[in-house]
Amino acid sequence: MSELDNKKDKSKDSNKKPKKPGAFSIGNIIIFVIVALLLIWVVFAFLPNNPGTNKSFDGFLKDLQDAARLGDDTIFFRNISFDVVLSRFNVTFVNGATTSSYFVNYPSSVAFQNLQIPGTTFTGLELATLAIANTSASGIGTLNFSGLVTPTNQALAILLSLIPTFLFVGIIFFVYKMQSKANGGMGGFNPGKNQAERIYTKIKFSDIAGNEEVKEEVAELVDYLKNPKKYSASGARIPRGILLGGPPGTGKTLLAKATAGEANVPFYFISGSNFVELFVGVGAKRVRELFKEARKSSPAIIFIDELDAVGRSRGAGIGGGNDEREQTLNQLLVEMDGMTENSGLLVMAATNRTDVLDPALLRPGRFDRTVTVGLPNVKDREAILKLHAKGKRISSEVSFQQLAKRTPGYSGAQLENVINEASLLSVREDTKIITLEQFDEAIDRVMSGPAKKSRVITKEELTAVAYHEAGHAVVGTQLRKGVKVQKITIIPRGSAGGYNLMIPEEEKYNSSKSELIAMITSFMGGRAAEQIIYGEKEVSTGARDDIKKATSIARKMVTEWGMSDLGPIMYEEDTSNPFLGRDYTKNQLFSDHIAREIDTEVRKIILTAEQKAIEVIQENREMLELIKEALLENETIVDEEIQYIAKNLKLPSMRTKAKSENVNQIRNVDELVKEVKDQTLIIKDKNDKKIKDSENNIKTDESLDIK
């Protein structure tokens, strides 16, 4: 199951609720700048000047009379201004080479107010700013100070002094209101606001490929959302909630959108993490607001993605019953169980961790149904690939059926990524159509990452990698019935120097003991080939991942599946996540003595498989050399070439290079077999000895325990 291209989703943006204007749009920034400049001007305009020292009125009067009566151009007033806030004169007086500044408190004497200065002796006074009310002295006639000096209005002065404070408060209020518009209701602090996004989706079930059973399970809910009264009249109770579980990328969210699109009802989307906040009670309030708004739009769908973020089992976290997450979960339980019967409100949720959810969520009346959206089978994968390939120019040689067989275990999201990677490769290589080779490369990219062709590898190391991968292919071809070696490559990808792709001819959900043993033997084929060619002391670290996988299977055979001499007993309980496949803990249910026996059984299975791999490669040494040569020549060989080599014991003519050294190497295979025969027998004797030693150790341990 998978989602359509992003371009199709963009065409539906018109159905979404318009976004609220942000607090930092261009218009708001301009307003902020204007207000800030106004504030700066007011502050500086009303800041008191520092005119110097205080001078008595008599001293000021003397300076004024001297400047007016004396015929000396070097004595004059440069500036006289009146401070309406502080009610005083600010004076700048020039006396020859000396310039002094002082201030004079506003005089109330009648002599000053009635002072008259003859204009004829008004020499060098420079009273362009003596105009206390910005009036210029012309130097002619008589200047009456009483007409120029107006007593200050104290109330006005106080009001003007408060302007900066009022302006500052206004700016704060303005910013607060703008934040309120952007965040809704409570300015920049509204933690309880509903975080769900309401959208109308046009996605239909026809836009989804695969998982037909899941679509049928959900389809009846569409009819309920369209005709809720029909179900009420018949006495039926439609599930209030549906939980979609499954691995990542299988289309759980897309399925919920398609349900809303088919029913043509509002769709409220929210992530489980949106309910969890720092402040206590915020999550519970958001749950209440979400359901309150959804009921107003009933019928509607509430979809909670990643439900495990808020729906984990209570009591398992830090904080006990006062944990904020638990309060949010309690509110969610109440809202789901407290809804009016058949109110037209459907709750859907998706999670990859159904194993950690609180049992109260899964009981009838809340999430009545739990639907597992699993990985697609081969038929579903083919349908998904065809769905995503619509509108793309693809070569006629591409078979989606074969591509589906080559991608076992891929989710819908990964299959969409395969199509997209192939399209990108087509653009990069400037081809008009997407070729089969580009699809092959896209599958390899999604599986293991891009090829590292620039990595410098010595010829000896490359030959060792070729032998290693050829060993896997030989054992897999000869032992694993129903499994096809699809592709072998020695091109480095990721951390691997090469890889061997084996896929089952038919997908199976259960494996027999013989199939598991064959799988382990196939994993040991690479290391076995290295032992035969280079000796036991020269095996490389390239088998690390093979050993890890083989050991994991062998241990599960002993501890979980009862496929050993210890009998059908479960010694370890696997608590790994069913969809994510990760082992978090292992519950040990056995004694130390049983633990030693388990280790011995695991070792016995691995060593027996390794010995079997050596025997198979020894019997098919010629095939090993041919596959190695094909890999060194072409770096990658596919199923048809592998089958040709296995059947005819020669390289395919279309891939063979006319090099005498290669022909000579192939002709001398019998000599190589003879040379390593003794070495193989030595390895076999060593492995037999290891197995016997392990069995003897068990017997010794048992005798000690009995004693």
From Swiss-Prot:
Provide the cofactor note recorded for this chain's UniProt entry.
Binds 1 zinc ion per subunit.
Active site: which residues? Answer: 469
The record ties this protein, via InterPro entries, to:
AAA+_ATPase, AAA_lid_3, ATP-dep_Zn_Metalloprotease, ATPase_AAA_core, ATPase_AAA_CS, FtsH, P-loop_NTPase, Peptidase_M41
Gene Ontology MF, one = metalloendopeptidase activity
Q: So which cofactors does this thing need?
A: Zn(2+)
Q: Which SMART domains match?
A: AAA
Q: What is its main location?
A: membrane
**What's one GO-annotated cellular component?**
plasma membrane
Top-level enzyme category: hydrolase
CDD domains xref list: RecA-like_FtsH
Assembly description? Homohexamer.
Question: What family does this belong to?
Answer: In the central section; belongs to the AAA ATPase family.
The protein's name is: ATP-dependent zinc metalloprotease FtsH
Task: Please give the organism.
Answer: Mycoplasma mobile (strain ATCC 43663 / 163K / NCTC 11711)
Task: State the taxonomy lineage.
Answer: Bacteria, Bacillati, Mycoplasmatota, Mycoplasmoidales, Metamycoplasmataceae
